[in-house]
């Protein structure tokens, strides 16, 4: 195994491409907040590494729901596998995976297993970029994640692009007795003053494990 260590700010900012979504769509943070607004507070949430987890952590901290989330810091692509494992052993609970386009692509095959979990909701925020590395583009320009999800076995798969659609599909997902996949199209970028979690990952893991036992 080889590891390449790179200093912070080593990457130049990526130049926008044709597929970069126009400003008429929600930012990922606003889309995430819209999702959160329609969730029960006690639903377990597993979030992918990077900016999405940092945005979710701010929302959780504000609403005192930090215990309900496992942030997969440094575990890109593994959120859905962890969510699948939890869904398997907590079949009476709805389990939510909050994923990114690059992360979902990294371990795409895992969705063949996650699709079988009837209590799982899998949401992919697709902004056609890796925001945590200056917006580098993953090779997803011609990929429709919701179509792939359907082929991989999800009972229902949707693509949404605005608040109303997000609200409708979240409500549908919470009532569904089968697996649901939602692709949310959103814009690139994040707030420059976005904070990081205050505690270490072990702390949040233990809090989440205690939450699951309730």
Task: For every predicted segment, state its role.
Residues 8, 15-48:
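Active-site pocket-lining segments that scaffold enzyme catalytic pockets across diverse folds
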Residues 3-5, 46, 181-183:
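A structural signal for short, well-ordered beta-strand segments and their strand-loop junctions
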Residues 10-15, 21, 43, 202-214:
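SAM-dependent methyltransferases
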Residues 1-2, 6, 154:
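A charged, well-structured terminal subsegment
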Residues 13, 54-56, 81:
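Phosphate- and divalent-cation-binding pockets in alpha/beta enzyme and binding domains
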Residues 44-65:
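Acidic-glycine-rich active-site phosphate/pyrophosphate-binding loop
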Residues 6-12, 49-53, 127-129, 185-190:
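Glycine-rich beta-alpha junction loops
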Residues 29-34, 38, 58-213:
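Thiamine diphosphate
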């Amino acid at each position: 195994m080889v590891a390449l260590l790179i200093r912070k700010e080593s990457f130049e900012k990526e130049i926008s491409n044709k597929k970069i979504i126009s400003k008429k769509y929600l930012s990922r943070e606003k889309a995430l907040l819209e999702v959160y607004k329609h969730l029960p507070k006690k639903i377990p949430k597993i979030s992918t590494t990077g900016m999405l987890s940092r945005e979710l952590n701010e929302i959780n901290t504000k609403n005192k729901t930090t215990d309900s989330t496992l942030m997969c810091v440094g575990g890109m692509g593994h959120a859905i596998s962890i969510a699948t494992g939890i869904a398997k052993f907590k079949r009476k609970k709805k389990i939510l995976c909050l994923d990114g386009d690059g992360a979902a692509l990294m371990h795409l095959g895992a969705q063949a297993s996650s699709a079988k979990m009837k209590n799982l909701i899998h949401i992919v925020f697709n902004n056609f970029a890796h925001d945590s590395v200056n917006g580098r583009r993953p090779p997803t320009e011609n990929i429709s994640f919701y179509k792939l999800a359907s082929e991989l076995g999800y009972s229902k798969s949707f693509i949404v692009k605005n608040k109303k659609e997000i609200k409708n599909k979240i409500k549908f997902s919470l009532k569904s007795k089968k697996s649901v996949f939602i692709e949310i199209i959103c814009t690139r970028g994040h707030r420059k003053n976005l904070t990081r979690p205050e505690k270490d990952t072990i702390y949040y893991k233990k809090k989440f494990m205690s939450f699951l036992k309730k």
